[in-house]
């Protein structure tokens, strides 16, 4: 079968290669790939900056944003031929640590977790893949090809779950205004879930051309180019990872405000910061800043529910390009108006 593979640590080694059929040891459920989402992590792996091949192998099958249909499944596993499904990315560490033992592998304490298409496990970027039933999510059939958004949606679902848990420290916490920084796939899905929670939503992005402002408006949210135009938010979901944006939103929230950092930054840049002023503001206003990454099964389930409730046409607007597998290279060549690019295995 064909698969998108890379040699981790070697820049631009990505290629469409022929690989063996997935072994039963990968999981009891055989899935035929329909689509594969492309994200920044994939580009980092392709650039040789990140990623680990499975032990004893030179190449890694790329891809962690999956969508497929069950081709074969054992009786009693909860899945049947034809089910629309997506695979969970992370697997718990082998020790396991207390978090992984409790099913919260997204909070792994020792770093020995593995990840499909990223760290020591082949990904979902092949014509067929196998998955363990416990790491497979069944999607609403009505979602069809839009189900490929489940992985970024799961990351957002975790962020919102933790925001609610932290907010519960104050019995009378009743947030009204949410700010999402960044109108990429994660930011737009964060805004979607905020609207589903009944919040007044503002979205900040540096680009007011292309489809992003229209998607924000169609959601019933307000698009901004400048932070000064945004009302004081109760919740901030930071999705850019841009240091300058992070500095701008620190301490900008309302009393008892919560800032979730969901974007990953690259290091090496320094910015001036009034630490004393920031500390004073955070202490006196009961502010919380926390980071959030990855997702566990409960978050995938919440994401699947959120996508099923969403307007299909709006979700379709997030996917700006679908590239057939035969022209796969185009999917990894960014274009100006890209939001989410998908490799179409069914075309």
Give the role of each language-model region:
Residues 22-36, 51-98, 140-142:
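Glycine-rich beta-strand-centered segment in the early N-terminal region that forms part
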Residues 65, 83-84, 99, 128, ...:
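Residue-level marker of beta-strand positions
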Residues 94-177, 181:
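NAD(P)H dinucleotide-binding glycine-rich loop of Rossmann-like/cofactor-binding domains
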Residues 143-227:
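Mid-domain Rossmann-like dinucleotide-binding core that forms the NAD(H)/NADP(H) cofactor-binding site
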Residues 165-177, 214-287:
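Glycine-rich cofactor phosphate-binding loops and adjacent beta1-alpha1 units
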Residues 205-209, 265, 295:
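Residues in the short beta-alpha loop(s) of Rossmann-like NAD(P)-binding domains
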Residues 247, 297-347:
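C-terminal hydrophobic helical "lid"/dimerization subdomain
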Residues 269-319:
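C-terminal substrate-binding/catalytic core of Rossmann-like NAD(P)-dependent dehydrogenases/reductases
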């Amino acid at each position: 079968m064909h698969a998108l593979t890379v040699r981790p640590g070697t820049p631009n080694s990505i290629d469409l290669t022929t690989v063996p059929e997935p072994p039963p040891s990968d999981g009891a459920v055989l899935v035929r790939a329909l689509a594969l989402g492309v994200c920044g992590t994939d580009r980092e792996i392709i650039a040789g900056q990140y990623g680990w091949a499975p032990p004893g192998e030179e190449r890694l099958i790329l891809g962690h944003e999956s969508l497929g249909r069950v081709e074969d499944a054992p009786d009693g596993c909860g899945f049947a031929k034809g089910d629309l499904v997506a695979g969970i990315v992370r697997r718990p560490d082998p020790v396991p640590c207390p978090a992984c033992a409790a099913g919260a592998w997204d909070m792994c304490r020792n770093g020995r977790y593995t990840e499909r298409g990223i760290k020591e496990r082949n990904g979902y970027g092949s014509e067929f893949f196998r998955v363990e039933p416990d790491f497979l999510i069944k999607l609403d059939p009505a979602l069809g090809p839009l189900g490929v958004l489940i992985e970024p949606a799961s990351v957002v679902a975790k962020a919102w779950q933790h925001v609610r848990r932290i907010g519960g420290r104050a019995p009378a916490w009743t947030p009204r205004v949410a700010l999402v920084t960044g109108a990429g796939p994660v930011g737009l899905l964060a805004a979607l879930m905020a609207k589903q929670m009944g919040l007044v939503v503002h979205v900040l992005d540096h680009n007011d051309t292309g489809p992003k402002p229209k998607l924000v408006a169609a959601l019933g949210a307000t698009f901004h180019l400048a932070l000064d135009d945004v009302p004081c938010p109760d919740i901030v979901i930071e999705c850019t990872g841009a240091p300058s944006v992070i500095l701008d939103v620190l301490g900008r929230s309302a009393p008892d405000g919560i800032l979730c950092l969901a974007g990953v930054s690259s290091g090496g840049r320094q910015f001036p910061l009034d630490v004393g002023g920031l500390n004073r503001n955070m202490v006196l206003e009961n502010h919380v800043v926390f980071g959030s990454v990855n997702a566990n099964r409960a978050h995938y389930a919440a994401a699947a529910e959120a996508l099923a409730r969403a307007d299909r046409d709006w979700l379709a607007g997030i996917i700006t390009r679908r590239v057939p597998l035969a022209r796969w290279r185009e999917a990894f060549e960014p274009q100006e108006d890209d939001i989410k690019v998908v490799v179409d295995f069914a075309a």
